[in-house]
């Protein structure tokens, strides 16, 4: 009785599916992302031209292509579009992504592109993720990416708890730092203006109280003077009346 030994999944994943000319291995995808990313940065994050895509395809074929399965510029472009869609899906997840190409695409097409003072995005070299047994994690296409993510599981999650921090130059050329500095300066100016306004209000209130006090004192003095004049007038009238009586 013959016994058959089941093939391991890793060995099968290296083989391109029959009839799949658009099949991409993990390593070919890594080379594609690096070649496309460099062109994308040199074009100041603009769209690649046809000649650029041909150069990207040449870079992939020089390392991973054979005569029967060379990648065309159109296949490279379609693959990058697929990777962008995959990135958006990973970006929308609440949990940290364990996808191999997430960090690199986040640097290239994420909401905030990290630039150095010279305006060049610093690229981080790709590293093969290791599973707990130490073997390289490989896959075929984006359909296999989800399977690979499940296989790696918590190991990659732990590995990504301490990712290598990219060096970001926060010099005068950093737009984020300039914006933060401008906001801080605006806050300081606003605080000084508000402080001066409060000081002016206090001074005006003091002046108003001084004027009110002075007016009140003048009014009381006038009333007292008027009262004295009235008393003097009454006194003169009494004296005059008593003098007339004595003369009779």
Curated annotation (Swiss-Prot):
Deletion consequences: Reduced ethylene sensitivity.
Compositional bias (Polar residues): 1-13, 130-141
Listed A to Z, the keywords are:
Coiled coil, DNA-binding, Ethylene signaling pathway, Nucleus, Transcription, Transcription regulation
- Ranges for the region named Disordered are 1-20, 123-150
**DNA-binding interval(s):** 24-113
Entry's Pfam families? Answer: Myb_DNA-bind_4 (PF13837)
Gene Ontology BP terms: ethylene-activated signaling pathway; regulation of gene expression
Q: Where in the cell is it found?
A: Nucleus; Nucleus, Nucleoplasm
Q: Name one GO molecular function term.
A: DNA binding
* Residue stretches in coiled coil: 190-210
The record's note on quaternary structure and interaction partners says: Interacts with the Agrobacterium tumefaciens virulence protein F (VirF) in the nucleus. Binds to EIN2 C-terminal region in the presence of ethylene.
Q: Could you identify this protein by its name?
A: Trihelix transcription factor ENAP2
- Tell me the organism: Arabidopsis thaliana
Q: What are the leading ranks of the lineage?
A: Eukaryota, Viridiplantae, Streptophyta, Embryophyta, Tracheophyta
Q: What is the gene name?
A: ENAP2
